[in-house]
Design a protein with these regions (language model features):
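Core catalytic DNA strand-manipulation module of type IA topoisomerases
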Residues: 1-175
């Protein structure tokens, strides 16, 4: 018959940045968990998207950042992506300067993003389409407002012997 000695609840509202655009490893991981593709398949798919369809930038990048020059080109790139995928989030704003735009974090290459080229989704295989849309989604996320979340931590002490901790996150505004 233990009783709760102390219950402490901490709440805070946080703004959350969008995920950075993909590098090859992150894209392979995403495609594995979302579509069941193995890393070699993702490499082949991205190679086709890059060379055959001219749909994405250099696909073997180890970097998740973009240059300030990419930020300047964003209105044109976003307009083409929206036309290609026939979807535009209502809050898409090319003036939002995400933390991914940072010349200091660029390595030999930059993040994998869509190109300014016209892409006909009907000419892509299902796998190519899935990967292309994932790349587009992560790129477009850079131009959406930050997500707003309420994070709660509840700590319960039980009879001086045990401490239980529970966490909760509630999305107040999607980013």
């Amino acid at each position: 018959n233990k009783r709760f000695d102390n219950i402490k609840i901490e709440k805070k509202v946080v703004n959350e940045d969008p995920p950075l655009p993909f590098n090859l490893v992150k894209l392979q991981s995403y495609c594995s968990s979302h579509f069941g593709y193995n890393p070699a398949d993702v490499m082949d798919i991205t190679q086709s998207l890059r060379e055959t369809h001219k749909a994405i930038t250099y696909n073997r990048s180890d970097c998740q950042y973009l240059s300030e020059e990419h930020f300047k080109e964003a209105p044109k790139t976003l307009a083409q992506v929206v036309q290609n995928i026939k979807f535009k989030p209502s809050e898409l704003d090319p003036t939002i300067h995400s933390k991914c735009f940072n010349d200091k974090n660029i390595t030999a290459h930059f993040a994998i993003i869509p190109t300014n080229n016209k892409v006909d989704l009907n000419k892509l295989t299902e796998r190519e389409k899935n990967v292309y849309l994932a790349v587009c989604k992560y790129y477009m996320a850079q131009f959406l407002p930050k997500a707003v979340k309420e994070k709660t931590k509840m700590t319960i002490e039980l009879g001086g012997e045990y401490t239980l901790v529970a966490y909760s996150t509630v999305v107040l505004k999607k980013g």
